[in-house]
Amino acid sequence: MKALFLVTRRVVSVMLTSCESKLPTWLVSHVGVRKIIVDGLSVLLLTILLLMCIIVVAVVTLKSVVNVLKRGIEKSGNRLNEFELKDRLLRLKSPEIRNPLRRNSKREKSLGHQKDF
């Protein structure tokens, strides 16, 4: 990490040197101000590079996960259309699944509401 910071610092310093003629003289003549500018731009450049790396890794990971899911769906042959998905959703929302019958009430239902004594 420190090596990357030193490289970016050197790059920024070279860039600042190459465009010194376009900057105000008070900005580049003071060593302290120049150091602050170089360090600030180096940190900014390093942060941008790290964020780009994180974004690339996240996109590649997400793409591979999506591809694995697609292959899994294709292998199992579960290509559901919109109506089948709605039907499954309605079945999941039905009260029978949310509140399953108790063991005794099933027996009562099958025996015509007669209770065993």
From Swiss-Prot:
This is 16 kDa protein. It comes from Tobacco rattle virus (strain PLB). It comes from the Viruses.
